[in-house]
Amino acid sequence: MAKKTPGTNGKQKLFCSFCGKEQDAVKRLVAGPGVYICDECISLCNEIIAEDHEHSHEKSEVFSEIPNPVDIKSILDQYVIGQDHAKKALSVAVYNHYKRVNLKEKKSDVEIEKSNILLIGPTGSGKTLLAQTLARIIKVPFAIVDATALTEAGYVGEDVENIILKLIQNAENDIKKAEIGIIYIDEVDKIARKSDSASITRDVSGEGVQQALLKIIEGTIANVPPQGGRKHPHQEYLQVDTKNILFILGGAFVDLPNIIKSRTGVKTIGFGSEEQRIQAENKDTLMEQVIPEDLIKFGLIPEFIGRLPIVATLQELNVDMLKQIFREPKNSVLKQYTRLLELENVKLTFHEDAIDKIAELAIKRESGARGLRAIVENIMLDLMFDIPSRKDIEEVIITAEVITDRVTPTLILKKESKIA
């Protein structure tokens, strides 16, 4: 209700309903239904609204100081050994993607397309670690999903929308944060269609999934079941805009070198171990020559490849690279176990020949970098079980025989006695 009081001449005096100032004390009083507001209160309201707008603009400019490609690669170098070409491609793609997000927020006239990425490389070559590290660098939510668990709608398996749900959960249910996150879809080569010609039968975990993923990867408003599982008509959905979610897809694409070889006519000449070395080098060289037609021949549909403008290949890891991976990265297996034993006041020493054998065994198992941890977990299990309850151990020494012959690691006791 507007405030009115009797004036000296008998007329009603009007007051601002907000600050209480009389009509004579302000420049203007604007009337509404039963209320009045003065020009000063209007100015104050405008300032508050402008401040709110600035704060929301600042919030949308989360990536105004995104690290440049050189800085991104420098951080990747601390966690992933080798793979320079892939790291450069990822650094540029991620930088441009989040610059694109900022342009969207600023309502730019220039439409920059999404930089979704396809990583091609053997198991354990660092695809997942690269994607995880990128998300940490940019400080955005991250989710990993397995393409083999996905099927098209109406069949047993997960709907493709569930990959968005995992990102929302990792964003602490903040949809706005999830909408600028990164999703890594692993084993995407497993959803290749069964032949390079169109099939008249349903391929529910292959081409059907590729078709279902198209819109989500390109950018759409996805209806996500809040509890996961299959969608049904009577439930409410979370609506998520995927246009600013960066999708990184990875796979081993085991038969791809043969497809490239048949196109390029490359032949391998050599004998014994020399032949194996040449084949490994040729394989890496071949993979670098991959073109969309090769991926179509492999079983990815053209529309799907069209949503993945950046293709980066990772090299097969050799013994020297695996030894570096074992020792050098910030979170290397060696550094992690060294730190774990330091917390028990025990020194951990790996002989050089032991590291050689670990790398050779990982190569033999074809498990790549992730195989290193599995090997060390196996040899360290009994030690990690016993050491916390023992206070007499000063040092643990791992020799080559521990790896090859399963002998017990050497323990140096604080009394300087040695138990083999």
From Swiss-Prot:
Keyword terms of this UniProt record: ATP-binding, Chaperone, Metal-binding, Nucleotide-binding, Zinc
PROSITE patterns on file: CLPX_ZB
Record keyword Lipid biosynthesis present: no
GO cellular component, one term: HslUV protease complex
Cited InterPro entries: AAA+_ATPase, ATP-dep_Clp_protease_ClpX, ATPase_AAA_core, Clp_ATPase_C, Clp_protease_ATP-bd_su_ClpX, ClpX_bact, P-loop_NTPase, Znf_CppX_C4
Domain of life (superkingdom): Bacteria
Biological process (GO), any one: cell division
Residue stretches spanning the membrane: none
Gene3D superfamilies: 1.10.8.60, ClpX chaperone, C4-type zinc finger domain, P-loop containing nucleotide triphosphate hydrolases
Residues noted as binding Zn(2+) in the record, renumbered to the chain: 16, 19, 38, 41
Binding site for ATP: 122-129
Record domain ClpX-type ZB: where: 3-57
Example of a GO MF term: protein dimerization activity
Task of the protein: ATP-dependent specificity component of the Clp protease. It directs the protease to specific substrates. Can perform chaperone functions in the absence of ClpP.
Family stated for the protein in its record: Belongs to the ClpX chaperone family.
PANTHER family documented for this protein: ATP-DEPENDENT CLP PROTEASE ATP-BINDING SUBUNIT CLPX-LIKE, MITOCHONDRIAL, ATP-DEPENDENT CLP PROTEASE ATP-BINDING SUBUNIT CLPX-LIKE, MITOCHONDRIAL-RELATED
Assembly information from the UniProt record: Component of the ClpX-ClpP complex. Forms a hexameric ring that, in the presence of ATP, binds to fourteen ClpP subunits assembled into a disk-like structure with a central cavity, resembling the structure of eukaryotic proteasomes.
NCBIfam families (UniProt xref): clpX, PRK05342.1
Protein name (database record): ATP-dependent Clp protease ATP-binding subunit ClpX
Species per Swiss-Prot/TrEMBL record: Leptospira borgpetersenii serovar Hardjo-bovis (strain JB197)
